[in-house]
């Protein structure tokens, strides 16, 4: 063999010991079995083959290890080397995460595209997740030499962008006496900014820390969540609210609008920062997010317009990327979310979609010849889903100063054919507290968001009662009445189909008309208009109050008119005489929140008073 080939095809790297290597015995799709792996650990990261493909050990038997490889395994051969790294699959946490886009194992896609000049990720590419050469503005807190620090303490802030302050914390497993802290200035992620001494051993720290993705980051204690996650979608905020630190599932068939709801949450929710994981969905959806988000702006309380991308991190693992990395992408996303939670922020994590993640589990499980359970999914599917969702919650963070943070998980589920008895949907519903069920029939009627108000539920309504009492004491009663109207409409629909609308009692006709108002002009929302893409909570409350006020007044008028001689007040008469008020009720949604809260509340109050006056005049006329 010519020497040029000999130089290129060396089996071992010169600096590595031979004992660090195993060798490939079997390749089956993304699963590789390697021998000679004595001393390897579960979930240890390994490099497989001459291309240094990234893999993770998922089973150990004797000296052979089963490895799931996160890249395409075509071209791997028996006896190819497998290099052990002695560390678990970890993510890099530090300044520079926000506004970035990673793949499932935290490789920065933009950097790879620039370096390789290719539209696809080259195999075995090794690029650091965060740029180590960028300089960051480092501002230490009031700490000096001799001070004691413990895990989780915030010791500095870094200016990440004009929207987010990045708090630098000590890793959870570190502690000691400060022997050096860097003065304020510009530093890269390679520079030492803090040095601690503990039991005579000195340890230096940079602004960067690594954390294994399968291990939840420790917290001081878990707290009960009591603040609503305001999404800007009326049907979710008013009828089926979630909390900051809650768990939500959005199951629905194709074309029901799961991705649009996930994106609306990312754009308009009251979270401080958002981690959007595109897990096994179409690449075009991720491309759409990448095109939309940088152009989207959010208005801050001081009137500044800022790009939504400044508070967002994207983890893209589309359906044409290797299957095994889908499993890792969910863990990568939640670990990044926990990192921002530990700074005291409220974080939302969108997982779109957990079904694709479960399918990746099914494929790996099949390759390992494990006993399949329902629909071929592994028997531990529910346990894996639960261990992911339980990383959500509102917590008291480790270290000082005392602070609370939260991670809210919103998982989209794509059951085949919209069948909610699918194992992934069933397992998810037994875990999550909020269920936003999407309905294909509503989507076909172009009613968006297509959340079915008869099957959806939220178990957080009681936890949020104190918030609602403070915001508006009437809201809980109004919401109960609105739900009753929608339920009553569903009961009446069968009767209407049999005998027609005219045969109904006047009260039932009013119920049907109010339900139509609620359905078409309150629950339906147009995400592509400036006035309706985002609905503040005060607007949601006032719109519902006026619709229910109309319902109550109309019922009272009909009841009063029923027992009197002369002309009765009927539903037809109400609609004929008060047509202009009815039109104003329908048009409430067109009020633009950009006008400001005082202007909108004044308009809604005026309509409330006009409704009362209109019905009073109608009753006086018909006496």
Curated annotation (Swiss-Prot):
One of its GO terms (biological process) is ATP metabolic process. It is an enzyme of class 7 (translocase). InterPro entries: ATP-synt_VA_C (IPR055190), ATP-synth_a_Xtn (IPR031686), ATP_synth_asu-like_sf (IPR023366), ATPase_a/bsu_AS (IPR020003), ATPase_F1/V1/A1_a/bsu_N (IPR004100), ATPase_F1/V1/A1_a/bsu_N_sf (IPR036121), ATPase_F1/V1/A1_a/bsu_nucl-bd (IPR000194), ATPase_F1/V1_b/a_C (IPR024034). Keywords: ATP-binding, Hydrogen ion transport, Ion transport, Nucleotide-binding, Translocase, Transport. GO terms for molecular function: ATP binding; ATP hydrolysis activity; proton-transporting ATPase activity, rotational mechanism. Its EC number is 7.1.2.2. ATP binds at residues 252-259. GO terms for cellular component: plant-type vacuole; proton-transporting V-type ATPase, V1 domain. V-ATPase is a heteromultimeric enzyme composed of a peripheral catalytic V1 complex (main components: subunits A, B, C, D, E, and F) attached to an integral membrane V0 proton pore complex (main component: the proteolipid protein). NCBIfam families: PRK04192.1, V-ATPase_V1_A. PANTHER family: H(+)-TRANSPORTING TWO-SECTOR ATPASE, V-TYPE PROTON ATPASE CATALYTIC SUBUNIT A. This is V-type proton ATPase catalytic subunit A. It comes from Citrus unshiu.
